[in-house]
Amino acid sequence: ALCDRLGITLAEECYSLDRVDIERSSYAHCPRPGGRAQLQAYDAAMLDVAHRLGTEAFFTGVGGDNIFQFTKSARPLVDRYLAQGIGLHLFSTLSDICRLTGANAFRVIREAAKVPRSGTQKYLWVPDERFLSKDAIAAAATSRLSHPWLEGPTDSLPGKAAHIAFLIRTQHYMDVHDRRWPTSTLHPLLSLPIIQACLAMPSWTACAGGVDRAYARRSFAADLPTETLTRSVKNGPDGFAHAIIRHHLSRIRERLLDGELAQRNILDREKLDAALKEQQIARGDDYPRILLLLDTEAWAEGWSAGSPASRQT
């Protein structure tokens, strides 16, 4: 529908297991891990389109949820109370959050009461400890990295502080472009004017009317087709991610249970062994974490080899 509205051609590609090498990291060119195996198939499809169409640059929608404050938190209610006090406007925001989340008013108010107020740290970074060994978790706790950007701002409203935290997360996307590609990758939603405009929006406007990213939807209401404007969910590569694990399960078990990370006591082999059973994979939701660890294993092997050739993609 969007391509029809804009008058541009839609290029459709399919994920292929043939384009995934679990012994190669999708972040092999980066100084830190963070990729997942399914990115290899996505990158391959992008390059196919680039070669076929003579593409010089890809414009992405990366960061949209962060910039437009996609949240189902009670923080906007706290912000509006701190900024404007009690009034009909507060009940309007309460109603918006209830409609957006499906929670009743008592649940939303209870969650709002837990939100830190001014003068305290507004957010905490909670590490994902799934499948990490006790020693690795303890080591990370005693040597936790810090940076001014990671400290919760004490002079902003709690909801806006969370918005800033969302923006910090976009740094993950900013330095992962493989410069060997024949194309550039541009993220227009992360441009400074858009960031500044969205940061200026009160947090409660992001859920106005009981819909997420409300001010972004209103801003483009005249330009987008109804199907796009009212979209609340979208498909992702979850099925393909499951297919990767099922197809390579025995090899994945070998690499994660006996690989570089396990040998360095970074992984909890017992928990991983239980998670990497066929029946558990079928019903579990740990597959993104497993694919991240799998890609990290390949990344660590590549850098441990010490040769640039070992990191070639």
Question: What label would you give each PLM region?
Answer:
Residues 294:
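Active-site helix-to-loop segments that bind/position phosphate- or nucleotide-bearing substrates
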Residues 176, 182-183, 194, 233, ...:
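Preference for short coil/turn "hinge" residues that link or interrupt alpha-helices
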Residues 72, 226-283:
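PAPS-dependent sulfotransferase catalytic core
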Residues 46, 160, 176-178, 253, ...:
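Hydrophobic alpha-helical segments, principally membrane-spanning helices and signal/leader peptides
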Residues 167-172:
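Short, motif-level signal for alpha-helix interfacial/capping segments enriched in acidic residues
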Residues 153-165, 290:
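Bilobed periplasmic-binding protein-like "clamshell/Venus-flytrap" ligand-binding domains
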Residues 1-154, 177-224, 284, 289, ...:
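ATP-dependent adenylate-handling active sites, centered on carboxylate activation for C-N bond formation
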